[in-house]
């Protein structure tokens, strides 16, 4: 839980272990060769529903732990869980489970999601958040900067003075 102004302040955090059955379902779905974005399966819909409800429960527990109401929260960003990420295929797509509309309805908090798919539709490689974050907090009008973010998928952001910020995935990370 963050408060973001011209700096980021961590208010609180809460995590739970992913239920093993759900984790196993997600791993199996990620191994599927078929385009699940165009051809969703019953298993995908079930995993999406389970992950969505797990997310809602974590949000509610975090609010309770923090002694906050949903009306105290401006917005919730939900990346979801990536099942397939194919930004460079003939028909580029990225598929995450965790339905932001249902999360919003059940928490009463405006929920923003589908970051990767929206970025791909607009010509990106599906990693839109890190460049925006880096631009806001690390841009310097007098210096060029390159920031490398090593996660499951590594990405790079170029902050070039007097030019538009650009960023992209570079490949596997940790």
What do the predicted segments below correspond to?
Residues 1-174:
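Short acidic/glycine-rich loops and adjacent helix/strand connectors
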């Amino acid at each position: 839980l963050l408060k973001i102004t011209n700096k980021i302040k961590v208010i609180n955090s809460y995590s739970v272990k992913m239920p093993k059955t759900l984790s196993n379902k997600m791993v199996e779905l990620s191994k599927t060769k078929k385009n699940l974005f165009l051809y969703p399966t019953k298993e995908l819909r079930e995993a999406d529903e389970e992950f969505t409800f797990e997310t809602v429960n974590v949000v509610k527990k975090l609010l309770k732990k923090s002694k906050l109401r949903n009306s105290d929260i401006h917005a919730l960003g939900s990346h979801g869980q990536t099942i397939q990420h194919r930004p460079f295929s003939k028909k580029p797509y990225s598929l995450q489970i965790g339905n932001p509309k249902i999360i919003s309805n059940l928490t009463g908090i405006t929920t923003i999601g589908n970051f990767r798919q929206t970025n791909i539709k607009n010509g990106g490689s599906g990693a839109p958040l890190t460049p925006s974050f880096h631009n806001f907090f690390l841009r310097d009008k007098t210096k060029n900067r390159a920031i490398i973010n090593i996660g499951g998928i590594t990405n790079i952001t170029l902050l070039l003075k007097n030019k538009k910020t650009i960023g992209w995935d570079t490949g596997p990370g940790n």
